[in-house]
Each structure stands twice: as C-alpha cells, then as structure tokens.
Amino acid sequence: MTKNAIKMWIDTARPKTLPLAVASIITGAALAAWSRQFNWIITLLCLLTTILLQILSNFANDYGDHQKGSDTVERIGPLRGIQQGMIDAKQLRKGLIIVAIASLCCGGLLIIIAYQNIADLLAFTLLGVLAVVAAITYTVGTKPYGYMGLGDLSVLLFFGILGVGGTYYLQTQQLNFSILLPAIATGLLASAVLNINNLRDIEQDRKAGKNTLAVRLGPENGRRYHCLLLIVSTLCYCIFAVIYVQTVTAFLFVLALPWLIKHGVFVSKHKEPLALRPMLAQMSLIALLINGLFSLGLLLS
C-alpha cells in the first residue's frame, strides 16, 4: 500500500471526529472515578470500542453517500478517498466490514470482562449490535436515517447517553440518573459537530435529497439550533456541578466557555458554507476540551 493510499484511508477514518469518541468515554470514566469505582481496563476497552464505532460510522457515511450520489466533487468539505478515486466502493465496503468485525470483537471482550449478571450480558450485547447497525445505517440501506433528519438524535443517544452512561455503568454497576445531565451535555456537543457538517453541506444535501435536520430547518434556524445546543449543554454541566458536586473545581469546564462562545458567534455571523469548513474540527476539539476539564474537575472534587 502506497503512502498516498494510507493517507486516503486515514482521511476516510476522519481523525478530526475521533475526539467525540474520546470525550464521551473520559466523562463516563471520570463519573465512575468520582463514585470511587474506576476500572482502567474497562475504560480502555470502552475507548477502543467507541473509536472503532466512530470510524465504522465514517466509513459507512462515505460509502452510503457515494452509492446515493450525495458526495460529489462540488462538496465544500474535504474530498474523501472514494471521491478522488483512490479508494473504490468495493475496497471501502471491505474496510467497513473489517472495522465492523473489530468493533464487535472489542465490544464483546468488554462485555465479557465487565458483566456481572446475565441481564447485563444480554442488554449490552443488544446495545453493542444496535450501535454497529446504527453506525452503518446512517447513510447505508434503502431508508438511511441520516437522510431523514434523525442523525442528531442518534448522536445524542450513542455519543451522549449510552457512551457516558454505559462507561459509567460497566464500572459501577449502578443506575444513577444524575449522570444523565453530563451525558446529555456530552451528546449535545457531539450533535453540534454533526450540525456544523450539515450546515456546511446544506445545499449539496438538499440537491441530493438528504434531508438532514439542517436542511429541514434551513440555514438561519439551523444556526439558532446550533447555539441552542451549545447553551443547553453548558446548562446541563452547570446544573450537575451545582446540585451534585458542589465544589469550585467542578466548574473547571467554564475555562473553555470563551472558546465555545467565540465559536457560536462565528457560526451565527458567517453565512457562507465555506467559512464553516474549519469549524467542524474546532467544535470537535472544544467538545473534548470541555469534557476533559469537566472530568478533571470531578477528579479534583
């Protein structure tokens, strides 16, 4: 495999989106540590499984959009390997299958190590299979849910509630509904990353019949929705810190708020899709920074 081919596979994996996978796991692990039940092996396996699922979703996204003709050379975002002809559909499908198998194997090992009873084993096995199916069917299949505007809900669920909550539960074996606040906050920040992508590609998606939430809302309301995601996520972190942690260090995440506010103002003011191109990576890093500071604050508490 040539250096160019390797680079194309790396680009197709979209490393700039991987901080989202890391963010949900470190938050769930920090919440478990805050409850004094941290397990580094489970955390590591959760992290690896989630990263593989993110890569699987990215591969499936490119494959599905290519098959449906949604991604063309006119797209504003970076051109993927399949668009440039460096990777053909057959190769990408093979890569997709390999990553799907790796995700299932890693997730299976995680469940075997972490489960305490048959109910947990069955529940997390089902959730693992659903996660793989959801990653693939976002754009692949006869009725991909990404084309129906349901991508944001899926991201909130898998990169927020299940990502954070699952990591927490597998270590503590406890259902603690208070952690829904940081879990939802993490998911909303991840949804903001997807929304930037969809705002940027809104015209191309509309032409291709890809009715993302941004397409349904339109450019103006899509930007209002983006700001709402940022505001509500911040409120969720604040409410959790005030009610459940009650220490100054729990508010470490506010150190990242100036960057978050600057990002929101930029997205609101700049209407040109091309201007949003660097915002996806920026939002992804902001999400990681906020979750990292929130997690550090929990550990110091």
What is each stretch, according to the model?
Residues L52-I76, A192-A214:
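Acidic (Asp/Glu-rich) catalytic motifs at the cytosolic membrane interface
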